[in-house]
């Protein structure tokens, strides 16, 4: 049986055409636009890095720490007690609206009754376990030095609201001062420290 043959008469290999400078530039512009769009999408809807300013969350977080915040968390499930959250606190002064991103720990959710007795935080009449509080702070002889607000009357957390507090109770401006916050103002859940490298870890 004859083997099939390939007629290559008149066949001339072609040199690959080199891309024109204009085409290369267009390709690079497309790559940059796609990369920037993806980065913007992630920052707006998925993950964002936040910089810690102030001592209100010590000793969990310190000034100049950087944390990653998951913006998808609360689209998938409810806010839980103990979560560390970043939220937008809106204030008005002289007709000017100001936005300030704060980071605190969730103490009470919708329907919870939160109170403070002798610096002990109670939720639904039970003292909550708070292993994240600084032991040196808890050992201070003065209750005021330990927590600033020694006693607080019971507060029932309204629908779609949260009661939040900083871990550094003497230095934190939180729901003990400005009341509960709307859950819709929560930006996301802080879940990891990414700076400094020596402190990298989950929250």
Model-derived features: positions:
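Soluble "head" domains of membrane/secretory-pathway proteins
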Residues: 2-25, 30, 41, 45-51, ...
